[in-house]
Amino acid sequence: MKLLTVLTLLTGLVAASPIDLEKRQRNELRVGACEEITFIFARASTETGYLGGSTGPGVCNGLKLARVGQVACQGVAPRYTADLASNFLPQGTSQAAIDEAVELFQLAASKCPNTKIVAGGYSQGTAVMHNAIPALPDNIKNMIKGVVLFGDTRNQQDGGRIPNFPTDKTKIYCAVGDLVCEGTLVITAAHFTYMANVADAVSFLLARV
């Protein structure tokens, strides 16, 4: 019953999203030119496209509006499928998702060595970032200027930080009443309020690039 409730709520989030399909399909690091800033994002469970339909494209669009012609947005996909079942794995997501995110950070560093990397995740996507970033070598970690995490499913488990990554480069958004931030997979209405934090997240990232 709990899993059915989670699925119903998450499906409703996607259906209600105002973000159009074109903006969800951001694959610009892989197929586009290098830009001054590269944004890598892992979407929430059941969200479609590369960036999802909420905070991912919200932050991407905010960065692009502030730094016109200087931002490439890249979603962690397609091997990260954002399925519900992977939330229950020990790392909070699949190894395939983690490996894909690691490869994207490596691609940004090798293809675009002068880019400034910023990153983010929402819900299960935060677990992707919590696991991928610590796996990177120090030279790539140093290229990451800021990370924003919404509804962090690894917040309690990792002590309110990304392991082995500077806390001053990380901003975690955990709404009052969002129980996933407290080490559970219980989904409440608070888990769907993070569009309200997008503008602040954009400002946080811009201040670091």
From Swiss-Prot:
Residues at the catalytic site: 123, 178, 191
Subcellular location: Secreted
InterPro entries the UniProt entry points to: AB_hydrolase_fold, Cutinase/axe, CUTINASE_1, CUTINASE_2, Cutinase_monf
EC number: 3.1.1.74
Site residues (Transition state stabilizer), renumbered to this chain: 45, 124
Segments passing through the bilayer: none
Leader sequence residues: 1-16
GO cellular component annotations of the record: extracellular region
Pfam families: Cutinase
Gene Ontology molecular function: cutinase activity
SUPFAM superfamilies: alpha/beta-Hydrolases
Broadest EC class assigned to this enzyme: hydrolase
Known catalytic reactions: cutin + H2O = cutin monomers
Disulfide bonds: 34-112, 60-73, 174-181
Superkingdom: Eukaryota
Keywords: Disulfide bond, Hydrolase, Secreted, Serine esterase, Signal
Any one GO BP annotation for this protein: carbohydrate catabolic process
Keyword Signal: yes
Primary site of residence: secreted
PANTHER family, per database record: CUTINASE 1-RELATED, CUTINASE 2-RELATED
Family membership: Belongs to the cutinase family.
Stated role: Catalyzes the hydrolysis of complex carboxylic polyesters found in the cell wall of plants. Degrades cutin, a macromolecule that forms the structure of the plant cuticle.
Entry protein name: Probable cutinase 1
